Amino acid sequence: MVSKIMNKKYEKGLSLIESAMVLALAATVTAGVMFYYQSASDSNKSQNAISEVMSATSAINGLYIGQTSYSGLDSTILLNTSAIPDNYKDTTNKKITNPFGGELNVGPANNNTAFGYYLTLTRLDKAACVSLATLNLGTSAKGYGVNISSENNITSFGNSADQAAKSTAITPAEAATACKNTDSTNKVTYFMK
């Protein structure tokens, strides 16, 4: 009889251990799913930001075809086109937002011929900054930059992308160095011809 009681106690204990193992396994699976969900979400935001830049570039080039300059170009012009999806239009504040919660700023070169116009994505975290800084826009781009303070005043393009304008596409190693702000305050700028 004592033997039966002891066996029952061991069976209960074994059941609790099994339950704990199942809960631990479930927690591990949940953590993995959350990690991959965040990764997929960030990737989706980056792809949406790239699409937004491409759409804005296409709209600007279409609107200014045949014009001698990009004078007067700003976000309000793009707000009145279908190039920017409605969920990124902040018509109240006359701004274009980006998928990372920042803005897409556009403007002409400030009385110089170094480039035609610029597009800047703001409030990017480090990972988004690296991803978007390495976007190569081909022959329509005059240059690229990370964390530049006065985009419209750039008059020359050099070999560094860190707080300066670079004449060639930014490499992943350069982007990792230039995107140094860890508090989602990085900016990526594309200078267009």
Swiss-Prot record:
GO cellular component, one term: pilus
Transmembrane listed as a keyword: yes
Propeptide positions: 1-13
Signal peptide stretch: none
Role according to the record: Major repeating bundle-forming pilus (BFP) subunit. Is required for EPEC localized adherence.
SUPFAM superfamilies reported for this sequence: Pili subunits
Family indicated by similarity: Belongs to the N-Me-Phe pilin family.
Lineage, uppermost ranks: Bacteria, Pseudomonadati, Pseudomonadota, Gammaproteobacteria, Enterobacterales
Keywords of the record: Disulfide bond, Fimbrium, Membrane, Methylation, Plasmid, Transmembrane, Transmembrane helix
Transmembrane segments: 14-35
Full protein name: Major structural subunit of bundle-forming pilus
Membrane topology, from the record: Single-pass membrane protein
Matching PROSITE patterns: PROKAR_NTER_METHYL
UniProt-listed InterPro entries: Bundlin, N_methyl_site, Pilin-like
Compartment annotation: Fimbrium; Membrane
Self-association and partners: 10 to 100 laterally aligned filaments or bundle-forming pili coalesce into rope-like bundles. These form linkages between the bacteria within the enteropathogenic E.coli (EPEC) microcolonies that are attached to epithelial cells.
Residue list for modification N-methylleucine: 14
Gene name linked to the record: bfpA
Main location: other
Disulfide bonds: 129-179
Organism: Escherichia coli O111:H-
